[in-house]
Amino acid sequence: MSLSNETKAKIVADFGRDANDSGSTEVQVALLTAQISHLQGHFSEHKKDHHSRRGLLRMVSQRRKLLDYLKRKDVSRYTGLIARLGLRR
């Protein structure tokens, strides 16, 4: 259920400051968004997988915390990121 290394590298290249920038807030949010999207497809087929649903809720909570942090620190980066990812708020 995790993302492939190629997908992760592409996300890091798209959202990071350079090819090795895997720790910036934007990259972390983008990776979590990709994992959340992947899990949503999983739940359409496996409706009773409550163990994975708990992991999904944890990822959503972590993404929310990172977005709140980014909004506090730099509003322009926050608005640009949610526009690029197509998130609400």
UniProtKB/Swiss-Prot annotation:
It comes from the Bacteria. GO terms for cellular component: cytosolic small ribosomal subunit. One of its GO terms (molecular function) is structural constituent of ribosome. Disulfide bonds: none annotated. Keywords: Ribonucleoprotein, Ribosomal protein, RNA-binding, rRNA-binding. GO terms for biological process: translation. It holds the Pfam family Ribosomal_S15. PANTHER family: RIBOSOMAL PROTEIN S15, BACTERIAL AND ORGANELLAR, SMALL RIBOSOMAL SUBUNIT PROTEIN US15M. Belongs to the universal ribosomal protein uS15 family. One of the primary rRNA binding proteins, it binds directly to 16S rRNA where it helps nucleate assembly of the platform of the 30S subunit by binding and bridging several RNA helices of the 16S rRNA. Forms an intersubunit bridge (bridge B4) with the 23S rRNA of the 50S subunit in the ribosome. Part of the 30S ribosomal subunit. Forms a bridge to the 50S subunit in the 70S ribosome, contacting the 23S rRNA. This is Small ribosomal subunit protein uS15. It comes from Erwinia tasmaniensis (strain DSM 17950 / CFBP 7177 / CIP 109463 / NCPPB 4357 / Et1/99). The gene is rpsO.
